[in-house]
Design a protein with these regions (language model features):
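Cysteine-nucleophile amide-bond enzymes
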Residues: 1-17, 47-53, 68, 75-85, ...
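N-terminal capping segments
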Residues: 3-57, 95
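Aromatic- and glycine-rich peptidoglycan recognition patches
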Residues: 11-13, 17, 27-30, 75, ...
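Intrinsically disordered, low-complexity N-terminal regions enriched in serine/proline/glycine
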Residues: 10, 24, 40, 53, ...
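...with weaker cross-activation on analogous glycine-rich loops/strands in unrelated enzymes
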Residues: 54-119
């Protein structure tokens, strides 16, 4: 079934989600360091995981997009699962926020992150973030 949301988001409501494929894609296509395109790289990983996503947007906008795609918010202290996606709010010089996907070992955005928090702006300012998961 094709759905067009109020925001104009077009996607298939009943599609097979493979978090493993999404995480694999993200890991294989990650750059050596950030190129400032985390939202694009994670969007491509979501598509590789089986969800046709036809709109982009900045990282922070995914806090609205992911629930439309049947992702639900999970607790920050819950155990990570492959395919979990973290979305950070914009803060300081990071006006678009940040987004990454968990591959089972590390967070991956446009690069393989060493930690969940990738910049001191997020660490020092108590930045808000949310983690999303889609059940199969």
């Amino acid at each position: 079934m094709v759905i067009i949301s109020a925001s104009g988001l077009l996607y298939l409501r009943h599609c097979e989600w493979s978090p493993e494929e999404a995480a694999r894609y993200a890991t294989e296509h990650a750059e050596k360091k950030s190129v400032g395109m985390c939202a694009l790289y994670v969007r491509k990983a979501i598509i590789a995981g089986g969800i046709p996503l036809y709109v982009g947007g900045d990282a922070w906008s995914y806090k609205y997009t992911l629930p439309i795609l049947n992702f639900h918010q999970v607790g920050k202290k819950s155990e990570r699962e492959v395919g979990d996606i973290v979305v950070f709010q914009p803060i300081g010089g990071r006006k678009y926020g940040h987004i990454a996907i968990w591959n089972g070992k590390q967070w991956v955005s446009d690069f393989k992150q060493r930690n969940l928090i990738v910049h001191s702006d997020y660490l020092n300012n108590g930045c808000e973030y949310a983690i999303y998961r889609r059940d199969r």
